């Protein structure tokens, strides 16, 4: 299996997440001419072309001879894209590795749709990235078919590592729903927290722009402390909580309003909804 620098990479879909990954790959030294992107929309295709990579409107042209194919299209068009690619790969001696970031599409469905005319199926990986990947600070969950090799897994890790600081491989596909509830939807939880912190401080008289800068940097700084410290988040919380101090007063309010249960139910709701979206019988 060639390295990420030597591999031919195809992106089917050139939206924001694909653009972020491509930018990350280029920053890691991947040759622009080794990347081809299929994108039907002129505006998106022009933005991608500005990065110096090859572009096309043909999925087969982009992915026909690629080593790694990233499917980054909307779930409702994923089946057609996969069937088109599977048909084009029938003459190939070796099939590519396929990574899907299409939400709610199961591995079994992907492998069925990607099956070639001679009944072979590409080794396939499902990935749940999150939006901080757009600034190179993503967190991704991944689940692979049992036939994936260690070299293929390393290739996927290298691709995801260009935009994700954390990539976690789960042992069961249903755990991707939990990943969705945790890190996939997670950025919105922090946005909401900062939103409400700013509103509270503004109501107490602090100018909104100052409150926004302070709250945003506090969120960023706390995250960096968790990344760089050997202490658990629980211990870090205890470290900054003096008995009967200001932080203690705030956290006591959290406890009295059952903040823990709010978080539990929120993650459970997102996880359950992710599972529903992955079940064709429950999709709206």
PLM regions and their residue ranges:
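NAD(P)+-binding Rossmann beta1-loop-alpha1 motif at the extreme N-terminus of oxidoreductases
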Residues: 1-65, 137-138, 162, 202-204
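NAD(P)-dependent Rossmann-like dehydrogenase/reductase catalytic/cofactor-binding core
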Residues: 2-6, 216-284
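Short pre-catalytic strand/loop immediately N-terminal to key active-site residues, enriched for Gly-Thr
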Residues: 7, 125, 175-181, 233-238
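Small-residue helix-packing motif on alpha-helices
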Residues: 35, 62, 78, 207-215, ...
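Rossmann-like NAD(P)(H) cofactor-binding subdomain of soluble oxidoreductases
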Residues: 51, 59-142
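Internal alpha-helical scaffold of NAD(P)-dependent oxidoreductase catalytic cores
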Residues: 112-123, 139-178, 191-228, 273
């Amino acid at each position: 299996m060639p390295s990420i620098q030597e591999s031919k990479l195809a992106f089917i879909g050139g939206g924001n997440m694909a653009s972020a990954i491509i930018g990350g790959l280029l920053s890691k030294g991947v040759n622009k001419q080794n990347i081809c992107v299929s994108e039907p929309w002129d505006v998106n295709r022009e933005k991608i072309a500005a990065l110096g990579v090859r572009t096309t409107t043909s999925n087969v042209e982009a992915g026909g001879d690629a080593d790694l194919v990233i499917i980054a299209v909307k779930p409702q068009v994923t089946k057609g894209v996969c069937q088109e690619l599977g048909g084009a790969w029938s003459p190939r001696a070796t099939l590519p590795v396929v990574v899907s970031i299409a939400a709610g599409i199961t591995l079994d469905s992907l492998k069925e749709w990607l099956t070639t005319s001679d009944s072979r199926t590409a080794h396939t990986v499902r990935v749940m990235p999150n939006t901080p990947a757009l600034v190179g600070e993503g967190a991704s969950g991944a689940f692979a078919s049992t036939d994936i090799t260690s070299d293929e897994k390393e290739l996927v890790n290298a691709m995801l590592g260009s935009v994700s600081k954390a990539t976690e491989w789960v042992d069961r596909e249903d755990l991707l729903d939990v990943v969705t509830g945790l890190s996939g939807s997670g950025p919105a939880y922090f946005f909401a927290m900062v939103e409400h912190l700013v509103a509270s401080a503004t109501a107490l008289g602090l100018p909104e722009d100052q409150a926004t800068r302070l709250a945003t940097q506090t969120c960023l700084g706390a995250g960096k402390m968790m990344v760089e410290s050997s202490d658990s988040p629980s211990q870090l919380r205890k470290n900054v909580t003096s008995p009967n101090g200001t932080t203690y007063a705030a956290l006591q309010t959290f406890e009295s309003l059952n903040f823990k249960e709010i978080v539990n139910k929120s993650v459970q709701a997102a996880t359950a909804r992710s599972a529903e979206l992955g079940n064709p019988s429950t999709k709206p």
